[in-house]
Design a protein with these regions (language model features):
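FAD-binding core/adjacent interface of flavoenzyme oxidoreductases
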Residues: 1-5, 23, 73-140
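Beta1-alpha1 glycine-rich phosphate/pyrophosphate-binding loop at the start
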Residues: 2-60, 64-67, 140-141
Length: 141
């Protein structure tokens, strides 16, 4: 069975894992943390969720679905990737995994301005996504 290592356990990585497992691949998802989605308090604009859901809960559901279908999830940090004639060697902090293919779904880092105390106001006036967060501030001064 062809093997796939997906680096990144956010929405893109988990969606890819679900599709790849259903296509008959042996899939391992490697992720080091919950990323930006895991820090999101309220999601109100995601199709299929009529009630507010947290990013952590959405990730939890996505992981459960991927695992139920057969993907293997590992919380670890990738330290390198090497390619040889036999495929890829993905080096992590807890060992090495081999795969026929590697998919990178590492997301993008949030650009936080270097302003003292800014973190304490995130979600309480400081926002990084106008399209996502504008609704929360409608009608407020």
């Amino acid at each position: 069975m062809p093997t796939l290592v997906i680096i990144g356990g956010g929405p893109a990585g988990l969606s890819a894992a679900i599709y790849a497992v259903r296509a008959g691949l042996d899939v391992q998802v490697l992720y080091k943390d919950d990323g930006a989605l895991g820090k999101t308090d309220k999601i109100e604009n995601y199709f299929g969720f009529p009630d507010v859901i947290s990013g952590a809960e959405l990730l939890s559901r996505g992981r459960a679905q991927a695992e139920r279908l057969g993907a293997q999830l590992h919380r670890t940090e990738v330290t390198g990737i090497e390619y040889a004639d036999t495929g890829f060697a993905v080096k992590t902090t807890d060992g090495e995994r081999h795969a026929d293919a590697v998919l990178l779904a590492t997301g993008s880092p949030r650009a936080v301005p270097d302003i003292t105390g800014i973190r304490e106001f995130e979600g309480r006036g400081v926002s990084y996504c106008a399209v996502c967060d504008a609704f929360f501030y409608r009608g407020k001064d």
